[in-house]
């Protein structure tokens, strides 16, 4: 059974604009949806945008803490922990059983491997492998985690 806060916003358009010939900003429609797994916990003021070119997906048994943002086209695997004030930008993929600790920013199109950990206050701009601990600004590899 999913526990989704009343203040969570799920399925709104993502933030994508292009300019026309005059320079005016034109909003780009997002035509895909959000697929939610089972046994989720989605906290207060979480936002999960629908996809632009694929569904945004939250895997089974994943827990998302208050004030987190999940952008369009993101895929989060099963049994992940996404802590408070995390921003996961467009088209990021997070592998099963991974954890992203508070106040992290994950740049667009980054891939985070399974069973990996992102330390608090990190800015991730590079792909993270399976079973890796990363942290810092910018985030860097710290160590391999036990399997």
Set out the residue ranges of the language-model regions.
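Glycine-rich hexapeptide-repeat left-handed beta-helix
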Residues: 3-35, 40, 44-45, 49-60, ...
